[in-house]
Design a protein with these regions (language model features):
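Conserved MFS/SLC helix-loop-helix module at the cytosolic interface between two early adjacent transmembrane helices
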Residues: 81-120
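Helix-to-loop junctions at the C-terminal end of transmembrane segments
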Residues: 82-94, 306-319, 405
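Extracytoplasmic gate region of multi-pass secondary transporters
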Residues: 50-51, 248-311, 363, 367, ...
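Helix-breaking motifs and short loop linkers at transmembrane-helix boundaries and internal kinks
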Residues: 62, 94, 115-121, 132, ...
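Cytoplasmic helix-loop-helix junction between adjacent transmembrane helices
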Residues: 125-162
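Cytoplasmic membrane-interface "Motif A"-like loop-to-helix N-cap segments
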Residues: 91-103, 315-328
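Glycine-rich segments within core transmembrane alpha-helices of 12-TM secondary carriers
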Residues: 155-179, 201-202, 387-397
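C-terminal transmembrane helical hairpin of 12-TM major facilitator-type secondary transporters
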Residues: 320-369
Length: 448
């Protein structure tokens, strides 16, 4: 996957496409994003549907909250170990083949969760699922870098990230329905049917991606020569603003580690919500799996327009940091209100909605930062490294919350820790180095 290519000289070289760049980018977006959003929706669903399985699985298999939290989180150990190698392979082989491989293998392993019968099998399959899915999200971020300039990525990434709340919006009711409808259908239990049914679409999507996704702008038969020149020209114009560096330099760059720390704090809060929301709703007095699924969809439904509006506003203002800081404090308020209203279903849902909408709107803005400062192999390695270090929080968060629940017999201590992490994230975002802020501003200004 290469960046922009050399362009022919002459004033008329990109004149046709240049007359309506918005129309051109809308066309690109409609071609790429619907398929990628659907794929990531199932990635999120297969990652977090264990939260709905918990409503019955822990009783059937006699798991404690600590066992569940460790199993939910161990996914991210496999994910982290395979993340950077996976993204470097994508850089060499191209997005089409590697993303298709990721989809097929994670779909098979997600369906295989139905054979879990002990803590050991739970841990092993969740670990392997993490290995299988590694590289998908940073690979998509890296892929979109080669289609959109920095000034458009806030909206584009916010649109792509709609997959996360969509998985909650659709996955909650669907998971609840499957577990209700298949409750007495042999040869499996309801939660086993849920894993099997929800794993199959990823395999089918892998086949679709293999035959339809274009690796590069120049491979897209649905674009004219003028349109390809226009897209390549916009990418070429910003390349000198980004650091030209190697894979090793991304590992040595202190900006990589600063951004990883920010992402770690954000992801801690995110998976604190995702893996435990069904349990919190259930403990507020809702016992039906279907109703838990329907009510758990409400925060995600609100997150969708929030992400779009915040992403567009951030692009128009060409400003990321203070948008993110405001969202961090909104998320803090959401977690603290969860403590206050944990036994009142509708107020609790309002608090969960604040926390969910805040984290969902923050993440696409975060990913505009590394895509503005790295390029080439350094971008592939830097994005994967930031993502892999950040998502280690996906292991820590569910395990920590489960351990604290077992230790204190209450959800409050875990919620207080998650609220504190939002404050830490806000401070780290505010402390983004001046050099990084200047470089981001230069790229944004260049693409206005």
């Amino acid at each position: 996957m290469s960046p922009a290519h050399a362009l022919p000289s002459g004033e008329g070289a990109v004149s046709k496409a240049d007359r309506d760049p918005e129309r051109l980018y809308r066309r690109v977006t409609w071609r790429l994003l619907p398929l990628l959003i659907v794929c990531y929706t199932f990635a999120y669903l297969d990652r977090v549907n264990v939260g709905f399985a918990k409503l019955q699985m822990v009783a059937d298999l006699k798991f404690s909250d600590t066992v569940y939290g460790l199993g939910a989180g161990i996914f991210f150990i496999g994910y982290v170990l395979a993340e950077v190698p996976s993204n470097l392979v994508l850089h060499k082989l191209g997005a089409r083949r590697w993303i298709a491989r990721i989809l097929v293998t994670w779909g098979i392993l997600s369906a295989a969760m139905l054979v879990v019968n002990s803590p050991t099998s739970f841990y092993v399959l969740r670990f392997l699922l993490g290995v299988a899915e590694a590289g998908f999200f940073p690979g998509i971020i890296y892929y979109l870098m080669h289609w959109y300039p920095a000034s458009r990525r806030g909206t584009v990434l916010a649109t792509f990230y709609l997959a996360a709340p969509l998985s909650g919006l659709l996955g909650g009711p669907v998971s609840g329905y499957i577990m209700t409808a298949m409750a007495h259908t042999p040869p499996f239990t309801a939660w086993q049917w849920m894993f099997l049914i929800e794993g199959i679409p990823a395999v089918l999507l892998g086949i679709v991606v293999f035959f339809t996704l274009d690796d590069r702008i120049d491979d897209a038969k649905w674009l004219s020569a003028d349109e390809k020149l226009r897209l390549n020209a916009e990418l070429a114009s910003e390349q000198h603003q980004a650091a030209s560096s190697t894979v090793g330099s991304a590992f040595r760059d202190p900006r990589t580690w600063h951004l990883s720390a920010i992402l770690f704090a954000i992801v801690m809060a995110m998976y604190g919500v995702f893996f435990w929301m069904p349990t919190l709703v259930n403990e507020s007095g809702i016992k039906s799996p279907l109703l838990v699924g329907l009510l758990s969809a409400i925060p995600y439904a609100v997150a969708i327009p929030t992400m779009i509006l915040i992403g567009r506003h951030s692009d128009r203002r060409a400003e990321r940091r203070f948008h993110m800081i405001g969202l961090c404090f909104t998320g803090t308020a959401g977690f603290l209100l969860c403590v206050l209203w944990q036994h009142q279903t509708w107020p609790l849902l309002f608090a969960l909605t604040l926390a969910t909408a805040a984290v969902m709107a923050t993440l696409p803005l975060f990913w505009t930062l590394p895509t503005a400062i790295f390029r080439g192999a350094a971008a592939a390695a830097g994005i994967a490294l930031i993502n892999s270090l950040g998502v280690t929080a996906g292991f820590v968060a569910p395990y920590m919350v489960g351990f604290l629940r077992d230790l204190t017999k209450s959800p409050n201590s875990g919620l207080y820790v998650l609220a504190s992490l939002w404050v830490i994230a806000a401070v780290l975002i505010y402390k983004v180095p001046a050099q990084m802020r200047t470089q981001m501003a230069n790229v944004e200004e260049l693409n206005k």
